Amino acid sequence: MIRRVWPVLLAAALSAACTHVPQKSALAEWSPSRNFDDRRPRLIVLHATEMDSAEGALRVLKSANSGGRVSAHYLIAEDGRIVQLVKDSQRAWHAGGGRWGGYNDLNSVSLGIELDNDGEEAFAPAQIESLLRLLADLCQRHAIPREAVIAHGDMAPTRKRDPSARFPWQRLAEAGFGLWYGDDLPEPPAGFDAALALRAFGYDTRDLPAAVRAFTRRFRGEEREALDDTDRRILFDLLNGGARP
């Protein structure tokens, strides 16, 4: 039977104790942004800056720029340096419009991490190692399920594609963050509804081709608008727990 993985994971986060939790990471420099509201984190959204430099991204994330004010809780530079801009308890303006699972306002329930990357290049090993350390810190301090790490493109599939098809999701899963599939993929049962399964996983399927693009970008490293047999097997495996680190 297909299990609704994400609602269960996020419900667990809701019930976790969160008293006297530090709202700044000891791993990061503090460089405050004024663009935030207050709220509590329950999942983590990964972004790519899609800019030429970390310094340029910092300026945008901290200023009232003409394109609309944006921010994130953390920025990780290509060399692995971590900068915190907004306290974890505060609502940074990073996600924009979108949906994931039962959530319609992702800014109110998530922490946003920007990765210094132009959206096309490979992610630097030092950057990924810093990301893994930061994820461990955030999940531990806020009792966020380690599986509750998603892409910006996952929650906004019609308008976003970051952190890109080159992001190493399997590497994260091997370290215990996010979800990945196993080596032996089971055959879905007769009548398996892939659209329903994508929605159960968390995707907004009102634009089904966009949801499929987001899924294949994350789990196959390419963008397609129709699922093939392997995609369907992967989706079925993920809904039943996927690979375990």
Language model: regions and residue ranges:
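Basic/polar, cationic surfaces and motifs that engage anionic cell-wall
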Residues: C18-Q23, G119, F123-P245
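Bacterial N-terminal signal peptides
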Residues: P7-A16
